[in-house]
Amino acid sequence: MTKAAFTKKSRPAGLVITPGASADRDHAMLLAIEHGIPELPVLRLTLATTSVPNAVKKIIEAGLNFADEIGVNPNKLAYGGRSFGGRACSVAVAEGLAAAALVLLSYPLHPPGKLDKLRVGHFPAIGVPTLLVSGEKDPFGKPDEFAAHLSAIAGQTTMA
């Protein structure tokens, strides 16, 4: 595990953040993130789907529109989300969405109680700095469960 460091030049110019599958853009965590970084433009995006391919399409479209709206190159945006939203963002980046960084909050490493059904097949294609935040009580993946899979991510990773 290495720490993701940004220079002024490489620092993300905006953040597209998505909630879990059953939540919307007004989820308390997304609001707290937006309010916690007032200097960074933030787009809180409701996905309104549990289909990863549909979510990926929505993330890409919203990211391109947001970059245009704030006047930055789309590859200067960071993407992330909570649970399903983070998973969808990670798949989008793995499939080629240019991004400055990835933020995965309570990433669903596996379905609760199904430790053998890992959602890490796309990790090697993630080549951007990635922050993973997980708690000891998270039924979708605890920090020690992530340890064996972080090295699969091609970009720098930080676990918190």
Regions from the PLM with identified roles:
Residues 1-78, 87, 91:
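Serine-hydrolase catalytic machinery in alpha/beta-hydrolase-like enzymes
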Residues 23, 136-141:
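Acidic catalytic loop of the alpha/beta-hydrolase fold
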Residues 41-43, 152-160:
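Catalytic histidine neighborhood in serine/cysteine hydrolases
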Residues 16-20, 106, 134:
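The conserved beta1-alpha1 loop
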